[in-house]
């Protein structure tokens, strides 16, 4: 093995640049060459590929997004596109790859491994919805962004005695909502996989009001990218009482910004480990961190598994928001 290719695919996540840096610098320090592939699998098929030098890799540590850009490219599920991508790998002499992205990106990575190009997947998504890893690259930063926004919303909620339903990202995963709900001291959390009762939440807010707390914060997961989750909840809530209530959607600000120290270290550990796996001749693996130990699992096992949110966080939120 002489050359490693690196790409980011799917939605961007803070810390992706640190993963790119770690893969490239680990490859260079191991006597290999590192090549960046712009725009994910679309860029691979188009041959939008360039060589990395060590000097290219240090200015990115504090930058969000991905310096390799990203794109969704469902056409790569077709063998014709895969073969075009492989022709580009041959053209540039790339022997193995690291793909940074979510579960959709892993399917493309596995296809390349099946075609004889060992590929390792790194979990780059704010949703924290990848099996076999406690945390994904970008989750911690997105969580902190959400909590910071909720803290600010609390200020105005308290000033105007209002209830705010704050919608966070995460697709079908509950993690951002659960963690942000506990961290921000929300009065309730509404998230996929957890039952909720609007009337019970309304009664809780009324009880709080009677006890001197005349505002409320409800954290709501978007749930399958439903942009109306928070407004719909507000409409339902008003059926159970005279609430001065507002809906706020935090939105894509959670996908950007300076990556947290935790995401930087996590991405660096995972990126370096991916190169070690490739040096051992391994492919078709997804890197994760479990109980603070970086490890790898077969991608096929990952596709058959389902990410489980931390149920105890939901119960903790309920216990602390009586």
From Swiss-Prot:
Keywords from the named record: Allosteric enzyme, ATP-binding, Cytoplasm, Glycolysis, Kinase, Magnesium, Metal-binding, Nucleotide-binding, Transferase
Location(s) in or outside the cell: Cytoplasm
Keyword RNA-binding annotated: no
InterPro entries named among the record's database cross-references: ATP_PFK, ATP_PFK_prok-type, PFKA_ATP_prok, Phosphofructokinase_CS, Phosphofructokinase_dom, PKF_sf
A biological process term (GO) from this entry: fructose 6-phosphate metabolic process
Positions contributing to Mg(2+) binding: 103
Residues annotated for substrate binding in this entry: 125-127, 162, 169-171, 222, 246, 252-255
Residues reported to bind ATP: 11, 72-73, 102-105
Gene Ontology MF term list: 6-phosphofructokinase activity; AMP binding; ATP binding; fructose-6-phosphate binding; identical protein binding; metal ion binding; monosaccharide binding
HAMAP family: Phosphofructokinase_I_B1 (MF_00339)
Subunit description: Homotetramer.
Protein name, UniProt field: ATP-dependent 6-phosphofructokinase
């Amino acid at each position: 093995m002489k050359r490693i290719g690196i790409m980011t695919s799917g939605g961007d996540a803070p810390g992706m640049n640190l993963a790119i840096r770690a893969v490239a610098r680990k490859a260079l320090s191991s006597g290999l060459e590192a090549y960046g592939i712009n725009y994910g699998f679309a860029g691979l098929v188009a041959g939008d590929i360039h060589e990395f030098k060590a000097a290219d890799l240090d200015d990115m540590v504090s930058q969000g997004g991905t310096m390799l850009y990203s794109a969704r490219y469902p056409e790569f599920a077709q063998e014709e596109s895969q073969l075009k991508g492989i022709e580009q790998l041959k053209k540039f002499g790339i022997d193995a790859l690291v793909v940074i992205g979510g579960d959709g990106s892993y399917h493309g990575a596995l296809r390349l491994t099946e075609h004889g190009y060992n590929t390792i997947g790194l979990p780059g998504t704010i949703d924290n919805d990848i099996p076999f890893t406690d945390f994904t690259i970008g989750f911690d930063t997105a969580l902190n962004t959400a909590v910071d926004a909720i803290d600010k919303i609390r200020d105005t909620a308290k000033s105007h005695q209002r209830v705010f339903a704050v919608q966070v990202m995460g697709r079908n995963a509950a993690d951002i909502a659960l963690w942000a709900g506990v961290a921000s001291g929300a009065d309730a959390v509404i998230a996929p996989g957890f039952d909720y009762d609007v009337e019970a939440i309304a009664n809780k807010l009324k009880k709080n009001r009677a006890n001197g707390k005349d505002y409320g914060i409800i954290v709501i997961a978007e749930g399958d990218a439903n942009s109306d989750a928070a407004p719909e909840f507000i409409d339902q809530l008003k059926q159970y009482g005279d609430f001065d209530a507002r809906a706020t959607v935090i939105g894509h600000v959670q996908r950007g910004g300076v990556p947290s120290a935790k995401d930087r270290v996590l991405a660096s550990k995972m990126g370096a480990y991916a190169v070690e796996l490739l040096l051992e001749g391994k492919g078709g693996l997804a890197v994760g961190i479990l109980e603070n130990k970086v490890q790898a699992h077969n991608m096929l096992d990952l596709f058959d598994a389902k990410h489980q949110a931390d149920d105890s966080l939901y119960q903790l939120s309920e216990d602390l928001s009586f």
